[in-house]
Swiss-Prot record:
Annotated family: Belongs to the GcvP family.
Complexes and interactors: The glycine cleavage system is composed of four proteins: P, T, L and H.
Entry keyword Ribosomal protein: no
Lineage: Bacteria, Pseudomonadati, Pseudomonadota, Gammaproteobacteria, Alteromonadales
N6-(pyridoxal phosphate)lysine modified-residue sites: 709
Its EC number(s): 1.4.4.2
Name of protein: Glycine dehydrogenase (decarboxylating)
Gene name of this polypeptide: gcvP
Length: 962
């Protein structure tokens, strides 16, 4: 029997070995192939010595799954989940278990990527289209986005849209009603300052007294009052004011739509539709506008088009509005949105149907009526005389009420002016109303819920005025009226899932996206009620588990990045960029250098960089790259010197977007610092840094971290994400704060960038688990394996395709770029053809035409085994052989497996296929691996031009689905 130590038998590194794809023997085989003795040797060949860390991370040792779960369970138990009546945009909800199990906890839904390859994403595209239909029906407007990050961010986007489209071109004032949620006003003010807009806050009716380009109103407002704005909106629109409305999605089920009142833009949080509060997120925001504003909409929009067979097919529409194409001229910097949560909300609407939603909304309103009637019967005065779910009470002994509430384990809303608010929700029961009477009135009140209900039924309720009762039908499309049984709902979800390719089927090698394993053990805590059901504005002493988790995660990220502090608030990488640039902006202002507003950005940068710089009020100056893809130092020096007086910063990605460690990165930092600028190092490629180098060690001042890339939060088909920023000490006082929650930091009073103080805190346990389980050694080994996998793929493919950029010792970092331009010139086969042909082989295409047009960028990550890498390599080699047949004239350039890809079942069943110069087997079973595990695209190649020229972004007739 082999003698093993107890430490070996305890297998503390078991999670590490399961997270990393290649086992030790495969790693050695791959190392031998690429010409390295060990992972450390390979690292030394790739990473410049000048930036290589000489010491290990100080995260701690790796641990087993059971140990990690036990530790985080202890943190969860420190959270006190009181019954929340705080409201303010966050409400208790009942997540239907059929959605919880089959969507939220299903890797077929949460590991997919943004549907840039729509032919293999028709399932979630349909679910998102349903979300858009829900949004349009409830708001009464024409065109909805596929989701934004949160309600407050959506408000800022609405303000920006208003300025873009308003005919009041000379106006520079945006009016905000003084009864909006405070966190919404906070985020709007932050964005307005960057744009140079003036924000005027006042009673809603005073909006007409100002020269405005736009105005924002809350429906219902923070106190619960619901108002008919029809006349006010008409008066404002007559003055060319763009009217925007923050609306409650559940209230809209019963209320007259803002669109019917004359609103131009309506937005809000879809959290109430079956998504837990999660201490602030993640939640999908809906955003809907009039059709005339469609070209100015922010974010993704799903539209209906057709494929090459003329069949209905869905795709992302009007992408020319977005950051990856328009860069600093984009409508928004939005990249990652909240697709997983939007899908949950859409399925919630599908499962309940219109009648089920009306029942839920009516129950919430009835309980609110009962609560109000009982309190008023006892002489309690209310601030509001109309309501959907919220009443605000004045004249109470606030201290006594608060003491009784805490003793009863409930949280109410306590405003600074002595008003006490109570917001009810889907989870409210009769017993909760009894408990609220006890807390607000004290014992012995004698009120009876059943008697009060009978009184309301007999007398009728006036809480929703007749003029504000919705008269039009909602959700009439058959999709919302046929899946109310759980069996049918389960099958509908499965039917959509089967149309999509996600990580649970095959590798997704998207460069710059880091589609690594999202381990099941990392995902488990997210569903626990101790994490899922916390209100973000609850007293912090009730959230000790969350607080400790955030502090531990922040300290680990500080160690990994080499920075001094971390701000968790940003909800995505793009929002992290915006937050980091704001910190730089405020830093310069604090030094009397507000004129520093120029941001240098290499021409190879991701589109979010210039878009974020524009949002932060900066002017973009592009610097050149040399033929090797590196920053042209001479051009950088010249431009830095030229704009030195006004230089704010540089935004640079490391390793570069070309997939190499630039040797001159420290010199780049020094050049910018010498001219008074700051260095923003984009953390998109952090998966090639962890444990080997760090932004702080390199010389940067601030970075965002994509927790949904490097730190294992799943991409969710296009969100959620997290983009916390790490900063050097001198920038720490200038990171985002929050108007509601102030934990006692120097940055507390700064403006917010997100609605919640800790952003999408509900998914932070995923990254916490990832780091805790891997430990210092595991994090470093993961990075090294990512380098190994990328260089193995690069060397294998270099025998068949030109590799565009390489660094020292002919190596790449964690990703490589293959150049398809010579192939296109010789054969007519395009990068699009190759991307779609990969679908036939069961793969999602790598990143296409970024950072160089006519290329594919491949990032395999550390989680893919040698077996899967070889399967992908074999597919690419086989495709190269197919291209050779086109080059040789064996297959026509306009009729071959690449040009016609992807192939569907309908293709091979069609007798017309016999006229093609290749067989059905070549079309759909091009490799042995595919024969035993076939993924079938459900549509042929989609016509993008047709989709944009014939824009249609709502649910189509059911016959088109069947």
């Amino acid at each position: 029997m082999t003698k093993q130590t107890l430490t070996q038998l305890e297998q503390h590194d078991l999670f590490l070995r399961r997270h990393i794809g290649p086992d030790s023997s495969q790693q050695q085989e791959m190392l031998n192939y690429v010409g390295a003795e060990s992972l450390d040797d390979l690292t030394a060949q790739i990473v410049p010595e000048s930036i290589r860390l000489s010491q290990e991370l100080s995260i701690g040792d790796s641990c087993g799954e059971a140990e990690g779960i036990a530790y985080i369970r202890g943190l969860a138990k420190q959270n006190q989940v009181f019954k929340s009546y705080i409201g303010m945009g966050y409400y208790g909800t009942q997540v239907p278990n059929v959605i919880l199990r089959n969507v939220f906890e299903n890797p077929g839904w949460y590991t997919a990527y943004t549907p840039y390859q729509p032919e293999i994403a028709q399932g979630r595209l349909e679910a998102i289209l349903n979300f858009q239909q829900v949004s349009m029906d409830l708001t009464g407007l024409d065109l909805a986005s596929a989701s934004l990050l949160d309600e407050a961010t959506a408000a800022a986007e609405a303000m920006a849209l208003a300025k873009r489209v308003s005919k009041a071109k000379k106006a520079n004032i945006f009016f905000v009603a003084d009864d909006v949620f405070p966190q919404t006003l906070d985020v709007v003010k932050t964005r307005a300052e960057c744009f140079g807009f003036e924000v005027v806050v006042g009673p809603a009716h005073e909006a007409v007294n100002h020269e405005l380009f736009g105005a924002l109103f809350q429906y219902s407002n923070r106190f619960g009052q619901i108002t008919d704005f029809t006349d006010l909106f008409a008066e404002l629109r007559a003055k060319n004011v763009i009217v925007t409305v923050a609306a409650d999605i559940m209230a809209l089920v019963l209320l007259k739509s803002p669109g019917a009142m004359g609103a131009d833009v309506v937005f809000g949080s879809a959290q109430r539709f079956g998504v837990p509060m999660g201490f602030g997120g993640p939640h999908a925001a809906f955003f809907v506008a009039r059709d005339e504003h469609k070209r100015s909409m922010p974010g993704r929009i799903i539209g209906v088009s057709k494929d090459t067979r003329g069949n209905r097919a869905l795709r992302m529409a009007m992408q020319t509005r977005e950051q990856h194409i328009r860069r600093e001229k984009a409508n928004s910097n939005i990249c990652t949105a909240q697709i997983l949560l939007a899908n949950m909300a859409s399925f919630y609407a599908v499962f309940h149907g219109p009648q089920g939603l009306k029942t839920i909304a009516s129950r919430i309103n009835r309980f609110t009526d009962i609560l109000a009637a009982g309190l008023q019967a006892k002489g309690v005065s209310l601030v509001n005389n109309t309501w959907f779910d919220t009443i605000s009470i004045k004249g109470l002994d606030v201290a006594a009420v608060n003491a009784r509430a805490l003793a009863a384990e409930m949280n109410l809303r306590f405003d600074a002016d002595g008003i006490v608010g109570v917001s009810l929700d889907e989870t409210t029961l009769r017993t909760d109303i009894d408990a609220l009477f006890d807390v607000i009135l004290g014992a012995g009140h004698g009120l009876d819920v059943a008697a009060l209900d009978a009184q309301i039924v007999a007398q009728g309720s006036q809480s929703i005025p007749e003029a504000l009762v919705r008269q039009d039908a909602i959700l009439t499309h058959p999709t919302f009226n046929r899946y109310q049984s759980e069996t049918e709902m389960m099958r509908y979800i499965k039917r959509l899932e089967s149309k999509d390719l996600a990580l649970n089927y095959s590798m997704i090698s998207l460069g710059s996206c880091t589609m690594k394993l999202n381990a099941a053990v990392e995902m488990l805590p997210v569903s626990w009620p101790e994490f899922a059901n916390m209100h973000p504005f609850c007293p912090l002493d009730q959230a000790k588990g969350y607080t400790q988790l955030i502090e531990e995660l922040s300290s680990w990220l500080v160690n990994v990045t080499g920075y001094d502090a971390v701000c968790i608030q940003p909800n995505s990488g793009a929002q992290g960029e915006y937050a980091g640039l704001l910190a730089i902006r405020k830093y310069h202002e604090s030094r009397g250098q507000a004129h520093r507003n120029i941001c240098l950005i290499p021409q190879s940068a991701h589109g979010t960089n210039p878009a974020s710089a524009q949002l932060a009020g900066m002017q973009v100056v592009v610097t050149a790259c040399d033929k090797q893809g590196n920053v042209d130092l001479e051009d950088l020096k010249a431009k830095a010197a030229e704009v030195a007086e006004n230089l704010s910063c540089i935004m640079i990605t490391y390793p570069s977007t070309h997939g190499v460690y630039e040797e001159s990165i420290r010199e780049i930092c020094n050049i910018v610092h010498q001219h008074g600028g700051q260095v923003y190092l984009d953390g998109a490629n952090m998966n090639a840094q962890v444990g080997l180098t760090s932004p702080g060690f390199i010389g940067a001042d601030v970075s965002h971290l994509n927790l949904h890339k490097t730190f294992a939060i799943p991409h969710g088909g296009g969100g959620p994400g997290m983009g916390p920023i790490g900063v050097k000490a001198h920038l720490a006082p200038f990171v985002a704060g929050h108007v509601v929650v102030k934990p006692g930091r120097e940055s507390d009073n700064n403006g917010a960038v997100s609605a919640a103080p800790y952003g999408s805190a509900g998914i932070l346990p995923i990254s916490w688990m990832y780091i805790k389980l891997l430990g210092s050694n595991g994090l470093k080994k993961s990075t090294q394996t990512a380098l190994l996998n990328a260089n193995y793929v690069m060397k294998k493919l270099s025998e068949h395709y030109p590799v565009l950029f390489r660094g020292r010792n002919d190596r790449v970092a964690h990703e490589c770029i293959i150049d398809l331009r010579p192939i296109k010139e010789a054969s007519g086969v395009t990068e699009m053809d190759i991307a779609k042909r990969l679908n036939d082989y069961g793969f999602h295409a790598p990143t296409m035409s970024f950072p160089v047009a006519g290329t594919l960028m491949i990032e395999p990550t550390e989680s893919e085994s040698k077996v899967e890498l070889d399967r992908f390599i074999d597919a690419m080699v086989s495709i190269r052989a197919e291209i050779a047949k086109v080059e040789a004239g064996e297959w026509p350039a306009d009729n071959n497996p690449l040009h016609n890809a992807p192939h569907t079942m309908a293709d091979i069943m069609d007798s017309a296929f016999d006229s093609r110069p290749y067989s059905r087997e070549v079309a759909v079973f091009p490799s042995a691996a595919v024969r035993t595990n076939k993924f079938w695209p459900t549509v042929n190649r989609i016509d993008d031009v047709y989709g944009d020229r014939n824009l249609f972004c709502a649910c189509v007739p059911l016959s088109d689905y069947e």
